Amino acid sequence: MLKAALYIVRGQPRRERRYRDAVEEILGAGGAQYAEYTMRGGEKARTYLPGAKGKTGNPTASKVEAIDALERLGYVKTMRRVQEAYEAIGGDLPEKMRQDLQRAISLNCADGKRYTYERLNVGGIGRSDFYTRRAAFLADVATGCGLE
């Protein structure tokens, strides 16, 4: 279970890149089709035409719907669970120490041979405490992703 959670954590940068690309694609997409006309007072106005597949003619609403649909995808849910688990690391510690611990656990999970406890220099946290917190983080990821 922890090994599967470790692979999920190692895939986090790829999921985040994929998510950012999808959001950029949605936000950068062209607007909806519209018809422009002149009102009696000489003011110009637009009427947005309904899009294909039942989408609204409002470009902002269409983009919101697309982002909502994106948030319901499996890889985005997994990405969110891992982010929540990272935020939960070291909740009982002062902020600076908590950030150092989050960074250290992140690096250790990415490459445990290169970033061992001794090389990470996490002040105020002992070796056994570090690995206990790392295991708790991976268990949190596993639980959040439904591996148990």
Predicted segments, located by residue:
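Short amphipathic alpha helix immediately N-terminal
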Residues: P94-Y115
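Helix-turn-helix DNA-binding module
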Residues: D111-S128
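N-terminal interaction/assembly modules
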Residues: M1-K96, L147
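DNA major-groove recognition helices of helix-turn-helix
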Residues: F130-G144
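Mid-sequence acidic-hydrophobic segments that form the walls
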Residues: A85, N108-D111, D140, G144
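Amphipathic alpha-helical interface surfaces
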Residues: T78-V82, L101, R133
